[in-house]
Amino acid sequence: MGKTLKDIFYRFSDDQVAFRYGVALKLSSMSLIFVGLVMFFLYILLKIDLIFFNANQFPGAKEFQEAYFDFVFSNSIDLLPYILGSLIIIFFAGLYLTYLILRPFKLLSKYCDDVCNGKKGSFNPEMLTDHRLLIMFSDYFFSVSEQMIAENKFKLTAIPERFTKVHKPVYDWSFFMSYFLIILALTVLSIIGVITVDTGIREQIIELSTNFLKATPSVKYFLSEQFVVFDLIVYLLISFHVAIHFSFGFYLYSKVATPAFAIFSTMRSFLKGNKSARVHLIGYSYLRDDCRKINKYLDLLSKLPE
């Protein structure tokens, strides 16, 4: 038991694991906050209902209030499993998202580690559709370095023109759009859940009002108008939710675009003759182990005679 807990502790203390779980928790938290805000505004509107009915002394208002609290409690209990289930789905979707984000770096570092340990490295760029600049140049870099190792000689290498004019991180739209679609799917899941809850509660409130209150035109008008107001609130929250996920998409992209460019520029500089070039990333601890393996591979190449 003690060993198991110790393994779990060390696993969660790993920077990459912490990053993956952190992203997954952020995604889950955004959806949870979104649902919480919708429920909060709905609760306020329903409280206004009670105040309105009691202030106007509608017949059956007292019975309506008692039924209302029973309704809120029972519906909260009924919705809890669905909310928890959705959060679990979003959490694991976040873990999968981070797996996709880190996969190119893992493949690069695995190749470097295999070669350094005397194994035959395998790097298949066709497996990846993201980080095309890094992947395409890495494929070129590894083909050149394999030849150097085979000949046991380090030699300066001409850089293909398409790689010489890149001096800053570039947007890989295929990468960004693929991850944005995943984030959008999570947003749609949250929105569908909120609309379903909103529709169900709305129907219940109308039914309660019909059963316990005199169905006067003023009551019908008040209920219809208050739900119009609530719809506006929901639309605003949905817009905010989508905007947050857009921002989160750019945030995730920045977490890999800068390191990808750093590795690319280091490899390019190395082929130009800067044998001391190494990957040094500050603030990207979740890639520390991968960068260490890449640097170890560069150490191996730098020891080749010229």
What are the residue ranges of the model-derived segments?
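Short, charged helix-helix connector/hinge segments
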Residues: K110-M136, S265-I282, D289, L304-E306
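Membrane-interface amphipathic/juxtamembrane segments adjacent to transmembrane helices
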Residues: N56-A61, L102-G121
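Alpha-helical transmembrane segments and their helix-membrane boundary motifs
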Residues: T4-R103, V166-G249
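Short alpha-helical segment of the DHp
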Residues: G94, P104, Y111, Y140, ...
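Compact recognition or signaling/catalytic modules
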Residues: V242, F246, F250, S254-A260, ...
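Non-catalytic regulatory/interaction regions at protein termini and inter-domain linkers
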Residues: M1-F19, K153-R162, G273, K296-D299, ...
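Cytoplasmic juxtamembrane amphipathic helix immediately C-terminal to a transmembrane segment
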Residues: G94-D113, G249-F264
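Amphipathic coiled-coil signaling helices used for dimeric signal transmission
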Residues: R132-A158, L252, I282, D289-P305
